[in-house]
Swiss-Prot record:
Protein name: Alpha-1,3-galactosidase B
Entry GO MF terms: alpha-galactosidase activity
Family: Belongs to the glycosyl hydrolase 110 family. B subfamily.
Top-rank taxon: Bacteria
Enzyme class, first EC level, given as a word: hydrolase
Keyword entries, A-Z: Glycosidase, Hydrolase, Repeat, Signal
Length: 605
């Protein structure tokens, strides 16, 4: 009887706090900072209790106190999630499983959420008008192993792991990092300059063979097969695999979501992955280090932010993105490939990339169009989905194939004898990306593939290593839609992009759709609305190399009123020796720019 009375009083105290003010003080559920205990069980109980006492639609704030909170896999939630552009291994262990909320705010008030093992820190699904603010996400033991080069020569490389890295030599003789419930034997890496934390010039993705590694003194290892003259003593290498099981924050099927003053310091996948969401605002959302004195050199295993098949508006501003292993932002949809044409209205279509399937592709009434994969040309007119059903599963969850019936007859050219993709036009967002800093990261700065208005302004792109801005589109490898029709890039500053080579890194700004048969392409992929399809104006470029703009298959491009300043910070090396390289383009204007060295060279092909 006493226990029943105690539990009743505990719940009454917690609920009464929010019943009047709609604020739940998480301390009342035992979620107290700086205890270093595993708070996963208490968090799950708190979320269940609060949800059971809140009417759907009530505005509720979960209020944490500032300080450190630890969450381990034991006692955490377990979910089956199919997350775009991540490894589709299930189940996922989830710290904050926030599902089916309206008007929810999670306010950390400076809380530092620390996760252990292999977890998805926070998910928000099927929710409306929700806000996440004032907290950070990190892991006690990242799955990337940071090491410092001590010696590098013909006999191999000697290195020292960072103090927090748990490591050993495994039974196969490989260097292995490990943590709570996981282990990893990385043989790839990214090299950083010790003092600047920039990627080392012309190193790109390193091969770091670890066969026969020996521990030559306590926590000092020698890898005889790892030989690389570019890696001088003092160089810091982030040893990594390409495994990406979960992002730091996962948003799916949400509407009107806001993230404010949220920092992701590490995640084994992307910092933020949003799919099938409508209207997302990021204000001071960052994927970043813990300041200048942070001993780490890396943040996330993949992109900082990634938006797959979203709609409405993506508004991202005032963020800091650094040290991540891919783009600061990537916006795209997903092509399905037609595998069978059953009749004039019906096809079997399939997700093609192994990291993109299992989530909803479309619903009845969605507008679609068709693209020929080889030339990336639109074929036939627009159509609408009359019915869409999973073909290889009983439910959408986990499905790779769909049986799709269209409202109008299919064009006779659209067959399963050659490659055709289907693009869902109803799930494309408008994008505003402004006042952000992107620096010291792998691969690219930003990537946009949406036909709706995209504005990129007042950002600083500082040593992004590859292309700073990429406009892509690919129905052959990544299967990421689509064409860019209305892009404005203005008042940005670019500092020494292209210190390394990665995919699509043809210039500081690269308009690079993946077109296997460009020779036979008659139409154009990007643009299409006259010369104002993509406008690049009033930007400032500082570069040590030649290529500023690469453009392929675009109708409508303006490059004007930009300043290009040549420096000697690094030796020029890029294979593209022209300021501008244009392949299969039309309606291009390059005018009123200031080239301090006078080089305005244009290569047209």
């Amino acid at each position: 009887m006493k226990r029943i009375i105690f539990n009743f009083c505990f719940v009454w105290l917690a609920v009464s706090a929010f019943a009047g003010s709609k604020v739940v003080e998480m301390r009342n559920y035992g979620l107290v900072p700086d205890t270093h205990e595993n708070l996963s069980p208490k968090l799950q109980k708190a979320l269940q209790d609060i949800k059971s006492q809140v009417a759907l639609g009530d505005k509720v704030t979960l209020l944490f106190e500032s300080g450190r909170y630890d969450f381990h896999p034991e006692g955490a939630a377990v979910r089956e999630y199919y997350i775009s552009n991540h490894d589709q291994d299930n189940p996922k262990t989830v710290g904050f499983p926030l599902e089916d909320w309206k008007g929810l705010t999670v306010d950390g008030q400076g809380a530092d959420f620390i996760f252990h093992g292999r977890m998805l820190p926070l998910s928000l699904l099927r929710s409306e008008n929700c806000t996440l603010r004032n907290f950070s996400i990190d892991f006690e033991t990242p799955h990337i192993a940071q090491v410092k080069i001590l010696e590098s020569g013909e006999e191999g490389i000697t290195f020292e792991p960072a103090a927090w890295v748990k490591c050993r030599i495994n039974e196969k003789g490989f260097f292995e990092a490990y943590g709570e419930g996981w282990s990893s034997a990385p043989q790839g890496g990214i090299a950083f300059e010790e003092k600047t934390k920039r990627l080392v010039y012309r190193t790109s993705d390193l091969w770091c063979p670890m066969e026969g590694v020996k521990e030559v003194s306590p926590r000092v290892y020698h890898a005889p097969q790892w030989k690389d003259a570019r890696l001088k003593p003092g160089t810091v290498v982030a040893l990594r695999t390409y495994y990406r099981p979960a992002p730091g924050i996962f948003l799916s099927n949400d509407k009107d979501t806001r993230l404010q003053n949220v920092k992701v310091h590490y995640a084994e996948g992307m910092g933020l992955l949003a799919q099938l969401c409508e209207n997302i605002t990021l204000d001071e959302f960052s994927v970043c280090l813990r300041g200048d004195k942070d001993p780490r050199y890396f943040t996330t295993q993949a992109d900082a932010t990634h938006f797959s098949s979203c709609r409405g508006k993506i508004d991202s501003r005032n963020g800091l993105y650094e040290g991540m292993m891919d783009d600061a932002i990537n916006v795209h949809g997903t092509y399905l490939k037609i595998k069978q044409r059953l009749d004039d209205h019906t096809v079997i279509a399939r997700y093609m990339h192994p990291q993109a399937y299992g989530f909803e592709w479309g619903v009845n009434g969605d507008e679609v169009q068709f693209v020929r994969s080889a030339t990336m040309e639109l074929t036939g007119g627009k159509n609408r989905v009359k019915e869409i059903l999973p073909n290889d599963k009983d439910t959408v969850k986990g499905a790779k194939e769909y049986r799709i019936t269209f409202a109008e007859p299919l064009d006779a050219e659209i067959t399963d004898k050659e490659g055709f993709g289907i693009e869902n036009l109803s799930w494309c967002p408008e994008v505003y990306f402004a006042d952000n800093v992107i620096r010291n990261n792998r691969a690219r700065g930003t990537l946009f593939s949406t036909p709706l208005k995209t504005v990129v302004e007042r950002n600083l792109f500082d040593h992004t290593s590859g292309t700073a801005i990429l406009l892509c589109g690919d129905c052959n490898g990544w299967f990421e839609t689509g064409a860019c029709r209305n892009v404005l890039i203005r008042n940005n500053r670019f500092i020494n992009a292209l210190t390394n080579m990665f995919q699509f890194t043809e210039a500081v700004i690269s308009i690079y759709p993946e077109i296997p048969d460009l020779e036979h392409q008659k139409k154009y992929f990007h643009g299409g609305k006259g010369e104002k399809g993509v406008v690049i104006e009033d930007n400032y470029f500082e570069t040590f190399d030649r290529p500023v703009l690469f453009a392929k298959s675009i109708d409508g491009l303006i490059f004007k009123n930009n300043v290009i300043r040549q420096n000697t910070d690094y030796p020029a090396f890029h294979h593209n020796k022209s300021r501008f390289r244009l392949l299969h383009t039309r309606n291009v204007k390059i005018e009123k720019n200031n080239f301090e060295d006078g080089d305005e060279s244009i290569a047209r092909e």
